[in-house]
């Protein structure tokens, strides 16, 4: 099993939803940026373990059809924060991002149980080893590049482009520019 927080309680206070969860030991990977090789290995180990889970037992659908439908609903409801777009898409509208996603959809999906937002703050480490995942609201059955793209983007932002190749090598994948661009663009809608 993959360690993750357990929900202890949920409630609404002053119109705000709250979850009370257990803590995981260790610290998120942003605390490991001074040890980039260790960070890459922990991230790769954690994602390999998550992606090795049996897809047949995952009831959560985050395949492209589901993500594009959710993204379209968020665009229609005005829930996409266009001011938070990455520099490559700054100045675009949420509708333009959705249109690009529809026009550039990759063929086929390499389905795994994916985290959905596999950035460094959402992966926990303890004593140089993988300790679990947090912020799993987008977890579900999805293309493995859903996680690899977000992980690579987070590596670039936090420790630099030079560490993408060691991370992918440790994970056991090769760079896929088209899928990287696609899933980073998809992330703008969420």
Where are these regions (language model features)?
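An acidic site on a long C-lobe helix of protein kinase domains
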Residues: 39-42, 117, 144, 163
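Active-site Asp-x-Gly
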Residues: 64, 108-113, 126-185
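ATP-binding pocket architecture of kinase catalytic cores
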Residues: 1-63, 74, 108
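Regulatory N- and C-terminal appendages and interdomain linkers associated
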Residues: 15-16, 188-190
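Conserved catalytic-loop position in the HRD/HxD motif
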Residues: 112, 117, 122
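Active-site catalytic-loop/activation-segment of kinase and kinase-like phosphoryl-transfer enzymes
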Residues: 45, 61-105
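Localized chelating/binding microdomains
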Residues: 5, 39, 141, 187-188
């Amino acid at each position: 099993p993959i360690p993750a927080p357990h929900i202890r309680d949920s409630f609404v206070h002053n119109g705000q939803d709250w979850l009370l969860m257990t803590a995981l030991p260790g610290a998120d990977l942003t605390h490991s940026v001074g040890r980039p090789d260790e960070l890459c290995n922990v991230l790769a180990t954690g994602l390999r373990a998550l992606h090795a889970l049996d897809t047949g037992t995952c009831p959560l659908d985050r395949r492209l059809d589901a993500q594009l439908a959710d993204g379209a609903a968020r665009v229609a409801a005005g829930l996409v924060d266009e001011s938070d777009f990455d520099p490559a898409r700054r100045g675009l509208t949420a509708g333009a991002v959705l249109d690009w996603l529809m026009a550039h959809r990759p063929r086929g999906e390499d389905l795994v149980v994916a985290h959905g937002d596999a950035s460094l703050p959402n992966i926990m480490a303890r004593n140089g080893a993988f300790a679990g995942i947090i912020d799993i609201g987008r977890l579900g059955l999805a293309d493995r590049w859903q996680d690899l793209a977000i992980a690579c983007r987070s590596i670039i932002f936090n420790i630099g482009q030079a560490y993408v190749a060691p991370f992918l090598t440790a994970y056991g994948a090769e760079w896929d520019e088209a899928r990287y661009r696609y899933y980073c663009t998809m992330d703008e809608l969420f």
